[in-house]
Swiss-Prot record:
GO terms for molecular function: dTTP diphosphatase activity; UTP diphosphatase activity. It catalyses: dTTP + H2O = dTMP + diphosphate + H(+); UTP + H2O = UMP + diphosphate + H(+). InterPro entries: ITPase-like_fam (IPR029001), Maf-like (IPR003697). Nucleoside triphosphate pyrophosphatase that hydrolyzes dTTP and UTP. May have a dual role in cell division arrest and in preventing the incorporation of modified nucleotides into cellular nucleic acids. One of its GO terms (biological process) is nucleotide metabolic process. Its cofactor is a divalent metal cation. It is an enzyme of class 3 (hydrolase). Transmembrane segments: none annotated. The record marks R12, T82, Q169 as: Important for substrate specificity. Pfam families: Maf (PF02545). Its EC number is 3.6.1.9. It comes from Agathobacter rectalis (strain ATCC 33656 / DSM 3377 / JCM 17463 / KCTC 5835 / VPI 0990). It is found in: Cytoplasm. This is dTTP/UTP pyrophosphatase.
Length: 205
């Protein structure tokens, strides 16, 4: 069985991976996100790849520098990134409260899409690497929000670390009219698809 490394500081992704019984360590990527793509699906795969590759590179460097201390083993690094998309606009995490208000007003009473990209970087015992990348899309419909509801939600602080300025699994759940697709994908990690992709690649978690 491979040692699994989650290249994300998101507590929601950590919880989702724990739910499927995976044993892993958390090692968040710290590099600056560089976006060269425009389509939401391509953006999330690009960013998830950057995160996974950064952490995998660090693992390889450490193993080379401490070869006498490291027991060779297969390693799987998982990187993920989530964005909200509405009318060709990509919404990441809000920069400030005003940005969160702008996003929530935009999404109020509408249907938008949530994209999560996932990248696996495999490192075998000999230090050879391989990659596999995919994305999942879920459509989410919101009820119409009043300005008071938006202000109250923003004052809770909950939107500030979430793509699109809301968390479907928290207090904002009362404003969700419906979803089409994987609920966990909106939370931050499509674990069912992740598991199926690993199975196709012959990886046991």
């Amino acid at each position: 069985m491979s040692q699994i490394i989650l290249a994300s500081a998101s507590p929601r992704r950590k919880e989702l991976l724990e739910q499927i019984g995976a044993e892993f360590v958390v090692c968040p990527a710290k590099g600056e996100e560089i976006i060269t793509e425009e389509e939401p699906s391509a953006v999330v795969m690009e960013l998830s790849r950057q995160k996974a590759e950064e952490v995998a590179s660090g693992v390889l460097t450490y193993n080379e520098q401490h070869a006498e201390l490291v027991t060779p083993q297969d390693i799987l690094v998982i990187g993920a990134d989530t964005v909200v998309a509405y009318e060709n606009q990509i919404l990441g995490k809000p920069k400030d409260e005003e940005d969160a208000r702008r996003m929530l007003s935009m999404l109020s009473g509408k249907t938008h899409s949530v994209y999560t990209g996932v990248t696996f970087v495999f490192i075998d015992k000999a230090g050879r690497t391989g990659e596999h990348c995919f994305y999942e899309k879920t459509d989410v419909s919101m009820y119409k929000l009043t300005e008071e509801e938006i202000d109250r939600y923003i004052s809770s602080g909950d939107p500030m670390d979430k793509a699109g300025s809301y968390g479907i699994q928290g207090r904002f759940a009362i404003h969700i009219k419906g979803i089409h697709g994987d609920y966990n994908n909106v939370v931050g990690l499509p674990v069912a698809r992740l598991y199926q992709e690993l199975r196709k690649l012959g990886v046991d978690v």
